[in-house]
């Protein structure tokens, strides 16, 4: 028996497909999402409709984004969901969620069992549209959820942690074992809720600087900040910001990264490095 086949569909490795089939887990996720009629609900990667059906039952209209042409076609002809669905057969990484929010006339509520092979880049894509998003609920690798919620001084803390927490309140919801899927993935999974901040707790003047700083610092996470960011910060400047130059990237809080980005915005280096 081929354990990659579920409901007559062969799971495609290149799309990172693992289909949710545990009813308790499905009910728990739908309860956490709590979809209501009139809301702009958007599902990424509906697959074989494990979440689409119970969410769609509560709604008059549901927008879905599905890259797999065969699965998009199945949804189009779904016996009771079909008429409710607006289907975008495309890669979610190419979706303009700001434009979609304008079209739907309100902030989006985004959810999905995300393909694990694109979950991190998709998170960064969605962060650029947080002003158009009310909240997000995603099934992800447990390791990715751990990184999203991690605080300083932990191995899981990294660039994803800083950027996610800059944009959103991050709330773990549920842990999910591999047996809840067909085919079962080789890793544990978890559901997370991301609620964009109405106002960032630590506003930055230029987001590109926060992105650049976190990239440079965490690309050399074993180095001290004095060394990894020495091209833009002198030890004296770091000390004046209340940051020990001997600290490493994983020791610096979200607030401190934002403080550093704002210093750079006000005091740009004479030459871009």
Swiss-Prot record:
Keywords: Cytoplasm, Methyltransferase, RNA-binding, rRNA processing, S-adenosyl-L-methionine, Transferase. The keyword Ribosomal protein does not apply. GO terms for cellular component: cytosol. It catalyses: adenosine(1518)/adenosine(1519) in 16S rRNA + 4 S-adenosyl-L-methionine = N(6)-dimethyladenosine(1518)/N(6)-dimethyladenosine(1519) in 16S rRNA + 4 S-adenosyl-L-homocysteine + 4 H(+). Its EC number is 2.1.1.182. It is found in: Cytoplasm. GO terms for molecular function: 16S rRNA (adenine(1518)-N(6)/adenine(1519)-N(6))-dimethyltransferase activity; RNA binding. S-adenosyl-L-methionine binds at residues 18, 20, 45, 66, 91, 113. Belongs to the class I-like SAM-binding methyltransferase superfamily. rRNA adenine N(6)-methyltransferase family. RsmA subfamily. HAMAP family: 16SrRNA_methyltr_A. PANTHER family: DIMETHYLADENOSINE TRANSFERASE, DIMETHYLADENOSINE TRANSFERASE-RELATED. Specifically dimethylates two adjacent adenosines (A1518 and A1519) in the loop of a conserved hairpin near the 3'-end of 16S rRNA in the 30S particle. May play a critical role in biogenesis of 30S subunits. This is Ribosomal RNA small subunit methyltransferase A.
